[in-house]
Amino acid sequence: MAFKLPALPYGMRELIPHISEETLSFHYGKHHAGYVNKLNSLIKGTPLESCTIEELILGQTGAVFNNAAQIWNHTFYWNSMGPNCGGEPTGPIRKKIEEKFGSFSAFKTDFSNLLAGHFGSGWGWLVLKDDGTADIVQTHDAGSPLKENLGRPLLCCDVWEHAYYIDYKNDRLSYINSWWNLVNWDFANKNLEAPFKWS
């Protein structure tokens, strides 16, 4: 069965002024959709058609892995943001952050600095480690915390250039600083309770 592009959890204009409608139309409508179409073409007529996205990420390499991981990563990224979100975390996620980093401010600085300094394309993640502590990790290109056993994803930020170049040009840090105004802490709290499933 062919995979379908998941619907965005908000409208194309609802992340303005932090992410423009033009960026979303290209990022979601071209890049994310392109990964879905490419994956479907790669697995059509093969036993992989019966696999879930997670199974493809964990069990495959090369182009199948890259496209499956990018589909999952982007879906998770869209859900990591929302209109009327941002601000400081509340609930259990705040406690996890403060236990690990001392304060939300310290966490925010560490996360921003890590992503601003990330070389090339990739992703920044807030994860829950196996020992129950929160941590910040980065993955390169289509890298996945699931594949690399880096912990359970709680939030992510996309630092591929197509995520920000229309709005911020080469100023990645300004994009990251603006992204904090969109962070969906309710989504992070849900991921503390149970792992996110794409399919």
UniProtKB/Swiss-Prot annotation:
<protein>
    <recommendedName>
        <fullName>Superoxide dismutase [Fe]</fullName>
        <ecNumber>1.15.1.1</ecNumber>
    </recommendedName>
</protein>
<keyword id="KW-0408">Iron</keyword>
<dbReference type="InterPro" id="IPR036324">
    <property type="entry name" value="Mn/Fe_SOD_N_sf"/>
</dbReference>
<keyword id="KW-0560">Oxidoreductase</keyword>
<comment type="similarity">
    <text>Belongs to the iron/manganese superoxide dismutase family.</text>
</comment>
<dbReference type="Pfam" id="PF00081">
    <property type="entry name" value="Sod_Fe_N"/>
</dbReference>
<dbReference type="Pfam" id="PF02777">
    <property type="entry name" value="Sod_Fe_C"/>
</dbReference>
<dbReference type="InterPro" id="IPR019833">
    <property type="entry name" value="Mn/Fe_SOD_BS"/>
</dbReference>
<dbReference type="GO" id="GO:0004784">
    <property type="term" value="F:superoxide dismutase activity"/>
</dbReference>
<feature type="binding site">
    <location>
        <position position="74"/>
    </location>
    <ligand>
        <name>Fe cation</name>
    </ligand>
</feature>
<dbReference type="InterPro" id="IPR001189">
    <property type="entry name" value="Mn/Fe_SOD"/>
</dbReference>
<feature type="binding site">
    <location>
        <position position="158"/>
    </location>
    <ligand>
        <name>Fe cation</name>
    </ligand>
</feature>
<keyword id="KW-0479">Metal-binding</keyword>
<comment type="subunit">
    <text>Homodimer.</text>
</comment>
<dbReference type="GO" id="GO:0046872">
    <property type="term" value="F:metal ion binding"/>
</dbReference>
<dbReference type="InterPro" id="IPR019831">
    <property type="entry name" value="Mn/Fe_SOD_N"/>
</dbReference>
<dbReference type="InterPro" id="IPR019832">
    <property type="entry name" value="Mn/Fe_SOD_C"/>
</dbReference>
<feature type="binding site">
    <location>
        <position position="27"/>
    </location>
    <ligand>
        <name>Fe cation</name>
    </ligand>
</feature>
<dbReference type="InterPro" id="IPR036314">
    <property type="entry name" value="SOD_C_sf"/>
</dbReference>
<feature type="binding site">
    <location>
        <position position="162"/>
    </location>
    <ligand>
        <name>Fe cation</name>
    </ligand>
</feature>
<comment type="function">
    <text>Destroys superoxide anion radicals which are normally produced within the cells and which are toxic to biological systems.</text>
</comment>
